[in-house]
From Swiss-Prot:
It is an enzyme of class 3 (hydrolase). This is Holliday junction resolvase RecU. It comes from the Bacteria. Mg(2+) binds at residues 87, 89, 102, 121. The lineage of its organism: Bacteria, Bacillati, Bacillota, Bacilli, Bacillales. Its EC number is 3.1.21.10. The record marks 104 as: Transition state stabilizer.
Length: 201
C-alpha cells in the first residue's frame, strides 16, 4: 500500500537528521602525542615526588638584547640570543652518583642521525665520564614507540666513526646491540633508573 500526503504528494522516507552510527577507531593507549621531553619531565617529577632521585632539566642560558615596555607592568622581549651552547639536557644525583644525559627523538624508523648531536655535547659528556659520572643518551624512535638507554661509552664510538668519515647515522640494530630498551609505563612514564640500576649498580 502506497502512503501519500493530503496534498497528493508521495511519501519518501528521509534519513536527514537521523544520526548515523559511526565506526569507532580502535583505542590505542600508546604515547598519545607526548614528546620525549614531556615523558622525561613527568618521569623526573615522579622521581622527585617519591624521593627516589633529584634530576632537573637544565635551562638554556639566554642573552636578552632588546626589550619593549608597552605598559609599565609588562615587558616584551623583542630580541634574544643563546649565550653559550648548552651542554646536555638533564643532570642530577641518584644514590650518591652524579648523572648527566642527553635526550633525543627521531621520526626515522631504521636509523638515528648523528647530526642531532653537537661537538660541545660530546666533549661535555666525555669530561663527565672521566670524572666517574654516570653519562648516557636516551634516544626515542617516535613512530615505532621505542626508547633506548645507551651508556655514553657505548654511544661515543658511533660519533668517532662519523668524525673519521664513516656513517652519519646509527642504525636501530646497532643501537639495540649496545642499549637497554626503556618500556613505557604509567608512573613513572619512562623508568630509566631501572637501566641505571641494571648497568651501574
Amino acid at each position: 500500500m502506497a502512503i501519500g500526503y493530503p496534498n497528493g504528494k508521495k511519501y519518501a522516507a528521509s534519513h536527514e537528521g537521523i544520526p548515523q552510527k559511526k565506526r569507532k577507531a580502535p583505542v590505542t593507549y600508546g604515547k598519545r602525542g607526548m614528546s620525549l621531553e614531556d615523558d622525561l619531565n613527568d618521569t623526573i617529577a615522579y622521581y622527585l615526588a617519591q624521593d627516589i632521585a633529584v634530576i632537573h632539566k637544565k635551562p638554556t642560558p639566554v642573552q636578552i638584547v632588546s626589550v619593549d615596555y608597552p605598559k609599565r607592568s609588562s615587558a616584551k622581549i623583542k630580541e634574544a640570543y643563546f649565550k653559550t651552547p648548552s651542554t646536555t639536557d638533564y643532570n642530577g644525583v641518584y644514590k650518591g652518583k652524579y648523572i648527566d644525559f642527553e635526550a633525543k627523538e627521531t621520526q626515522n624508523t631504521t636509523s638515528f642521525p648523528l647530526s642531532n648531536f653537537h661537538d660541545h655535547q660530546m666533549i661535555h659528556m666525555a669530561n663527565v665520564l672521566k670524572q666517574d659520572g654516570i653519562v648516557f643518551v636516551i634516544i626515542a624512535f617516535q613512530k615505532i614507540g621505542e626508547t633506548y638507554f645507551i651508556p655514553f661509552e657505548k654511544f661515543y664510538p658511533f660519533w668517532q666513526r662519523m668524525q673519521s668519515g664513516g656513517r652519519k647515522s646509527v642504525t636501530i640494530a646497532e643501537i639495540q646491540d649496545v642499549s637497554d630498551q626503556i618500556p613505557y609505563g604509567l608512573n613513572p612514564r619512562l623508568d630509566f633508573l631501572k637501566s641505571i640500576e641494571k648497568l651501574y649498580f
